[in-house]
Swiss-Prot record:
It catalyses: N(6)-dimethylallyladenosine(37) in tRNA + (sulfur carrier)-SH + AH2 + 2 S-adenosyl-L-methionine = 2-methylsulfanyl-N(6)-dimethylallyladenosine(37) in tRNA + (sulfur carrier)-H + 5'-deoxyadenosine + L-methionine + A + S-adenosyl-L-homocysteine + 2 H(+). It is found in: Cytoplasm. Its EC number is 2.8.4.3. Pfam families: Radical_SAM, UPF0004. Belongs to the methylthiotransferase family. MiaB subfamily. It is an enzyme of class 2 (transferase). Catalyzes the methylthiolation of N6-(dimethylallyl)adenosine (i(6)A), leading to the formation of 2-methylthio-N6-(dimethylallyl)adenosine (ms(2)i(6)A) at position 37 in tRNAs that read codons beginning with uridine. PANTHER family: CDK5 REGULATORY SUBUNIT-ASSOCIATED PROTEIN 1, MITOCHONDRIAL TRNA METHYLTHIOTRANSFERASE CDK5RAP1. Its main location: cytoplasm. This is tRNA-2-methylthio-N(6)-dimethylallyladenosine synthase 1. Coiled coil: none annotated. It comes from Mycobacterium marinum (strain ATCC BAA-535 / M). GO terms for molecular function: 4 iron, 4 sulfur cluster binding; metal ion binding; N6-isopentenyladenosine methylthiotransferase activity. The gene is miaB1.
Amino acid sequence: MTQDHIVTERPPATRNDTAGNATARTYEVRTLGCLMNAHDSERMAGLLEDAGYIKADPGAPADLVVFNTCAVRENADNKLYGSLAHLAPIKASRPGMQIAVGGCLAQKDRHIVLDRAPWVDVVFGTHNIGSLPVLLERSRHNQDAQVEILESLRTFPSALPAARDSAYAAWVSISVGCNNSCTFCIVPSLRGKEADRRPGDILAEVQALVEQGVLEVTLLGQNVNSYGVNFADPDPSTGEEPLPRDRGAFAQLLRACGRIEGLERIRFTSPHPAEFTDDVILAMAETPAVCPHLHMPLQSGSDQILKAMRRSYRRDRYLGIIDKVRAAIPHAAITTDIIVGFPGETEHDFEQTLDVVQKARFTSAFTFQYSPRPGTPAADMPDQIPKNVVQQRFERLVALQERISLESNRSLVGTRQELLVVAGEGRKNATTARISGRARDGRLVHFRPDSADGSVRPGDLVDVEITDAAPHHLIADGPLLQHRRTPAGDASERGQTPTTRGVGLGVPRITVAQAQIPSSGTHPDTACR
């Protein structure tokens, strides 16, 4: 195999039905973990559909089940192996059924997955998503499990076709990998060092999505505001020059996305406080399409714990960023991530976290109980906190944040909010007939359409007046103030989602039949937040 190409074939994704007729094989992708994983799952689905598979109907048994896994939290491990155990007898009763395990846990536990679940057919990692169809066919042909884990990225996942889940909102990856070394996190060792997509390629993908009706994009990266430190090399066929390091690249990217006609909402996740710069705040404030929402992980409010976590910022730095954001964008919603019970966390350390939460007045927070992950420095630290202490602190933190969230949401009662109508995110019952939408600042709003005739569709935009509030959502039970039907709503009504082909990304493309594929065995290279 040459170094310039990763090779794919178009394997025959068919099976025989009960009458002996060849029919397309069905697939299901189950995602565990973060937004990066969810976006990778869209790429896996796109690859499979490109190879001839069709998506299984909800609740119907699939001929292929793919797990895209997470290695950050223990419950993701438990969920994976519990699901695999549940599938074992189903697979035994369905000749030809296949199971594949990919993602961060597969990258980390490459030698363990088959020991614990020998009925798995394919194990692949974070760096070779594009190999999935070939590995499935090789396993089927050889009647043997295939394990292929690469140690470095050859192709950006965004170079692969995608089967998007939504007609109106899309994720767009701007980088992969991470250059930080947080002691609780295993992602850098699984996804590698940061590599940034070239801005022209990102903008081309966003433009293609908008042309298909998408109204909102979320720019994804492990650390979006370090974008520009390591641009990928250009595709040699383009004749483009390599791009120099550019610390202002993320702010420039936000402004450039904001100039794309038809793109109404821009979000991004997640920035790192240590590298958050004033030019990004200015770009957020001056670009109308950028939503007034900042999700910025805190992790702890104690300088001592932040140092132990290797977070490379301190509480005053964090609070200073929030002050600047609120000065420039007074109505911004600010959300965060917090870990409780990190090794060595004292009661004073925890009270420091509560103090930052009080001062920051987060709109909402994702709160987690620390769990040691093998392979991370924190797992071997002394002074691991007893479970009962962690639970008690967790409950105190949640109670405080719930109170702050409710106060924040109540402050919006009586205000007018523009909502992007969403599918599957809220309450809808026979009594209220409510459906749901997301405000520009990201808050979930349950509202009552003027009629139940389906004229308000996912992807449409509506204006409502907020009538009530709860910690995790808002209510708008009055009449609609405005309803704008959109091309995204038209597509949603038709059940149509955008399709994106590979865009030139400055790393080797997947190409068809440019070198010989080994017919069996393990690839020689075998071995996140």
